[in-house]
UniProtKB/Swiss-Prot annotation:
Localization in the cell: Secreted
Known function: Antimicrobial peptide.
Signal peptide residues on this chain, from the entry's feature table: 1-22
Taxonomic source organism: Odorrana versabilis
The protein, known as: Ranatuerin-2Vb
Length: 67
C-alpha cells in the first residue's frame, strides 16, 4: 500500500510540473501574438505617415519651384 501511495504521489507531482510548463509555454505564445499585432499596427501607422510626408514634400517642392 505504501509503494502505491508513493507511485500516486510521484504521478501527481510529475503531472503538476507538466501542466505548469504547458501553461507557461501557452502564456509565452499568447504574448508573442500580441506583439505581432502591435507591430502590424505600428507598421501601418508608419506607412501612412511616410505617404503623407512624401505628398506634403512634393507639394512644397512644387510651390518652391513653381510646378
Amino acid at each position: 500500500m505504501f509503494t502505491l501511495k508513493k507511485s500516486f504521489l510521484l504521478l501527481f507531482f510529475l503531472g503538476t510540473i507538466t501542466l505548469s510548463l504547458c501553461e507557461e509555454e501557452r502564456g509565452a505564445d499568447d504574448d508573442d501574438g500580441e506583439e505581432e499585432v502591435k507591430r502590424g499596427i505600428m507598421d501601418t501607422v508608419k506607412g501612412v505617415a511616410k505617404t503623407v510626408a512624401a505628398s506634403l514634400l512634393d507639394k512644397l517642392k512644387c510651390k518652391i519651384t513653381g510646378c
